[in-house]
Amino acid sequence: MRNTARVILPALTLALAGCSGTEPEESRWQPHPGLAWQWQLDTRVDPSVDVPVYDIDGFENTVADVARLHRDGRKVICYINVGAWENFRPDKADFPRPLLGEQNGWAGERWLDIRELTVLRPIMERRFDMCRDKGFDAVEPDLVEGYGNDTGFPLTPRDQLRYNRMIASIAHERGLSVGLKNDLPQIPQLLPDFDFAVNEECAQYDECARLSPFIASGKAVFHVEYAEPTSRFCAESRKLKLSSMQKRLELGVWRKPC
């Protein structure tokens, strides 16, 4: 992830690949480095920004919203929170209470016990089914670095790797590309599993070079800064081939790209 085995094993590998349910990599959208993008998570999308990629909330937007963006030639990423329970989502009752941990600093959100793969997998499968059925091209799974936070659970880096790989496989089984959100320490292990990266504030913390493995693999890095002005990070972003812009924290329509 060969003697008589040189003949038998390749055939067996092809047969198993055909039964796995995972879409071939070449059939998925693969965003390349440097693509401009819009990231809007506050309510339904405003389609007026002229960029090739939109990252929008999977619950708040409709089939018609995604179809309109496609008619305009856009690719569309489905934002889904996979690391925290949200009390404002229609499937909030699907999460067993023992899986809900500490509040994460955002209103109505609590960390999830991501060790419970068998419980969380069908919930996330239904969410990614929604993304696929609405016509999205990719998924942005949020909060995939709980092991570095006070979640209320003794999460380890190994727990996070297992969960993140499960999330990536759920997306790929549905023909969706998937992005690694932040989680810089695990890029070396997770690079083969993810099709692009989404990063917040790597310039503020002088960490943008850590995303270079994605760029070197021909995979886009969609990057935002909140507090830093473009004058402080765009030169490095262009050098590193990041898709960078400044946004306000509420992630509305406003953007200031490099």
Task: Mark where each language-model region is.
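Bacterial N-terminal signal peptides that target proteins for export
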Residues: M1-I8
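A residue-level detector for conformationally permissive "hinge/kink" positions
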Residues: P10-L12, A171
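Nucleic acid-interaction modules of nuclear/chromatin regulatory proteins and viral regulators
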Residues: M1, G21-T22
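Residue-level signal for mature regions of secreted extracellular proteins and peptides
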Residues: L12-T13, L251
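Glycan-processing catalytic domains of CAZymes
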Residues: T22-C258
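C-terminal motif of bacterial Sec signal peptides marking the signal peptidase cleavage site
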Residues: A15-G18
